[in-house]
Amino acid sequence: MGRGKIEIKRIDNATSRQVTFSKRRSGLFKKARELSILCDAEVGLLVFSSTSRLYDFASSSMKSIIERYNETKEDPHQTMNASSEAKLWQQEAASLRQQLHNLQEYHRQLLGQQLSGLDVEDLQNLESKLEMSLKNIRLRKDNVMMDQIQELSRKVVTT
């Protein structure tokens, strides 16, 4: 059975407040350490008590974490190093090339070219898509023609 929820408000009794601070601080530091280990994250934690005492935790060097924080704060787009960024752009370019290739192949299939690699199911799917496209084209053509007829009828009536 879980613990009941407590109301989050300032603890008036100084001794109780200090005990709670100490327990919660150690729990917070434990969670920070676990996050660092489990997720291979660089974690820095600073806590000042009500008596201005400093408590800190750093998974590596607090100085390097603070420097990294300041650099990121100044230029948030500089969080990746050059090789990571280059790798990211290479992956993006490869993905876009593959997308372009797939679209070109699909376009050729719609034009009736390069159908030799398709099996019966693929050909049936392509046929269905073409029939749907043809249906949409005919519907659009009918709508345009109806609009033109109505426009001509209005012109005849007004003259």
From Swiss-Prot:
GO biological process terms on file: positive regulation of transcription by RNA polymerase II; regulation of transcription by RNA polymerase II
Keywords attached to this entry: DNA-binding, Nucleus, Transcription, Transcription regulation
Tagged with keyword Plastid: no
InterPro entries: MADS-box/MEF2_TF (IPR050142), MEF2-like_N (IPR033896), TF_Kbox (IPR002487), TF_MADSbox (IPR002100), TF_MADSbox_sf (IPR036879)
SMART domains cross-referenced by the UniProt entry: MADS (SM00432)
Tissues where the protein occurs: Expressed in seedling roots and developing seeds.
Statement: the UniProt record of this protein carries the keyword Nucleus: yes
Residue ranges of every copy of the MADS-box domain listed in the record: 1-61
GO cellular component: nucleus
GO molecular function: DNA-binding transcription factor activity, RNA polymerase II-specific; protein dimerization activity; RNA polymerase II cis-regulatory region sequence-specific DNA binding
Cell compartment(s), UniProt: Nucleus
Sequence ranges assigned to domain K-box in this UniProt record: 86-159
Function: Probable transcription factor.
Protein name, as recorded: MADS-box transcription factor 23
Taxonomic source organism: Oryza sativa subsp. japonica (Rice)
